[in-house]
Amino acid sequence: MNPKKLVIASRESLLAMWQAKHIQGRLKALYPDCEVEILGMTTRGDQILDKTLSKVGGKGLFVKELEQALYDGRADLAVHSIKDVPMDLPEGFALAAIGERANPFDAFVSNQYTRLEEMPEGAVVGTSSLRREAQLRARYPHLLIKPLRGNVQTRLSKLDNGEYDAIILAAAGLQRLKLDGRIRMILSESDSLPAAGQGALGIEIAAHREDLYEVLKPLNHGVTNACVTAERALARALGGSCQVPLAAYCTEENGLLTLRGLVGHPDGSVVLRADAQAPAEYADALGRAVAKKLADDGARELIGAVLNTEN
C-alpha cells in the first residue's frame, strides 16, 4: 500500500520535532509519492514546569493532546519517546511500530566535574526522574538531589546559570540534538539502570486504522520491539509510572533476552534488583517473571509506601 498523505502529531520541543522529522524522513524514503506533514502541538506536560511529573499526573501529560489529534483525524500517527508513553494506552490506541533503539543510558553533564565520583559532599545534582534519584541517592548519599524540569535546552541553561553542579539527562536526547559535547560520562547500569523503553521511539495510531499497520511495519525494529515489550511488561505488572522509582533494561544476544529490573525508594534507602533470561518470543512473559521476582522481594509494598508518601 502506498499512502498519499500522512500527518505526524508531535510535541513542539526541539527534541520531539527532531524525532518527528526523523520518522518523516523514513516515511518519505519508503513512500516517495506520499506527502508527509508534521502537526506540532504543545502538551500539558510542556506547560507545567514548576512541579515534578510524579506530582502532576505523570507521563500521560505528554501524549494526551497527541492522542486527541489521532482520535479526531487531524493526525494519522504520533511519534513519542517510548519512555514517556504510559504502560497502558487508552482504549482505542495502539503502538504500531517501535524503531531501532539509540543509546539507552543516562548521561552525566557538568561544567565543573568529569565524573559523578568526583563530586564533593553537598554538590547539587538535578534530575527529572525518581528512578534516577533513587539510584543516585543509594550510591552517592553525600550528594544533594534536586528536581529539574523543562526541555533539554532549559535544563542545560539551568546548569550553566549555576543552579546545579551537574545534571542527569537521557544520552539519546543529547546525541539526537548534536549536544554530545556536553556529555562528561555515560552512566553505567550499576549507577543508573535505564527507564523502560529509554532511547527508543514509538509510533502510536488509532487502533482502528488497519491501513496504517502495514504502512508503518518497515519502521519496526524487531529486537528493539522485543526488548521494549519485556521492559514495559515488567513496569506494567508493578504499576510502573513516573510516580515510582522503577527501571527496566533488556538486551538481546542470539535470540536470547536478558532483562534487568529495579525498584527503589526515592531516598535511596532501599533498592531491589532482579533479572532473568528468556527467548525473544517470550518477551512479555519475561517482563512479568522479573516483576514477580521483584514483588517477591517486597517491591509492591515498597511502591505502595512511595505512592502514599507522594500523595
From Swiss-Prot:
Its EC number is 2.5.1.61. Its cofactor is dipyrromethane. It is an enzyme of class 2 (transferase). GO terms for molecular function: hydroxymethylbilane synthase activity. It catalyses: 4 porphobilinogen + H2O = hydroxymethylbilane + 4 NH4(+). The gene is hemC. GO terms for biological process: heme biosynthetic process; protoporphyrinogen IX biosynthetic process. Belongs to the HMBS family. It comes from Neisseria meningitidis serogroup B (strain ATCC BAA-335 / MC58). Pathway: Porphyrin-containing compound metabolism; protoporphyrin-IX biosynthesis; coproporphyrinogen-III from 5-aminolevulinate: step 2/4. HAMAP family: Porphobil_deam (MF_00260). One of its GO terms (cellular component) is cytoplasm. Binds 1 dipyrromethane group covalently. This is Porphobilinogen deaminase. PANTHER family: PORPHOBILINOGEN DEAMINASE. Keywords: Porphyrin biosynthesis, Transferase. The porphobilinogen subunits are added to the dipyrromethane group. Monomer. CDD domains: PBP2_EcHMBS_like. The modification S-(dipyrrolylmethanemethyl)cysteine is found at residue 242. The keyword Transmembrane helix does not apply.
